[in-house]
Amino acid sequence: MGKTALIHHVFQQILKEKLAYCLYVDLYPTASIRDLTRQLATATMNVLPQRKRIGKKFISFLKSLRPVIKYDPLTGSPEVRFEYATDTDYEVTLSALLNFLNEQETDVCLAFDEFQVVTSYAEGNAEAILRTMIQPLNNIHFIFSGSNRHMMNEIFHDSKRPFFASTRIVSLPAIPSEEYGRFIEDRFNERKRTITSDAIGFIIDWTRRHTYYTQSVCNTIYGSGGKNIDLQSVKVICGEILEEQEKTFLQYRHLLTLNQWQILMAVAKEGKVYRPTAAEFLEKYSPGTPAGVTRALDSLMTKEMIYEESDINGRYYSVYDLFLSRWLERQ
């Protein structure tokens, strides 16, 4: 289960117990406050039951904002747009939408997914605008989620940024191997399939217990149709997964300098690199000078090819895409 699926799963539990209204807003396709306003209005309209009092209140409120409502020809779901002349009008409307939700008797859980996108908004100061709007709200529980760890850390950990110290950071550790193994075995058994313990162990180790990749591998294994899955068949399928993506991975080579590519490959082969400028690493992979390695790592992080994380042994670098990492190991 990835972060987005986890948010929806939590929302399902909240809705089941009727604790709050839950709104999910994907910011990935947005590029401005204007786009965010449209996404939030659309999400609110689709979630609040229109036949109930709160839904009728929202429709009445929405009309005062002069919206343009269109319906998706495939799903029939409404899409809300606004056609204002100035950026300020969109900021006023966004603030009004948030205040409307905040004033309801029932709590609201609002998830902004891919939140790091706001750092590249056309407004330039979008973080400050949003922080000013959000700070006084006490009836909305915000979830800020993002796939770019580097940018998310900068947004919430940099003392010079508007959202510094404004949230509680939640880190999700990897699921324990034994527990994960039982779960995988149970899911296959439910579908009248058998999978050996060493095959499960290989899946868990190969995917490093990263839920997205573990689920992807297991789905591919299940889709292969095999009834009795052993270690060898799992290894073959993992190899096929990498071969399917090889053309994409080769394209990355043309997007990077030779030095960046060499360092990316070195990080992949190590799995985790704690001291990239240490003599041992430099002698083993000959990636250049310590200064050159540092510049290359910074560039690779900006390109979201690698990420920086911490464990009990200290801070380390790893390749962002695990399938790419496994493919590079074989080169």
What are the language-model segments listed below?
Residues 149-167:
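Short regulatory helix/loop adjacent to the ATP-binding pocket of P-loop NTPases
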Residues 181, 185-248, 258:
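Amphipathic alpha-helical "lid/sensor" segments that cap RecA-like P-loop NTPase cores
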Residues 80-148, 157:
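Conserved Walker B catalytic segment
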Residues 1-109:
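P-loop NTPase nucleotide-binding core
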Residues 13, 129, 220, 299-303:
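Alpha-helical DNA-recognition elements
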Residues 4, 210, 321:
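Short, conserved phosphate/pyrophosphate- and ester-handling motifs at nucleotide-, phospho-/glycolipid
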Residues 243, 247-331:
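C-terminal leucine-rich, beta-strand-based interaction scaffolds used for sensing/assembly
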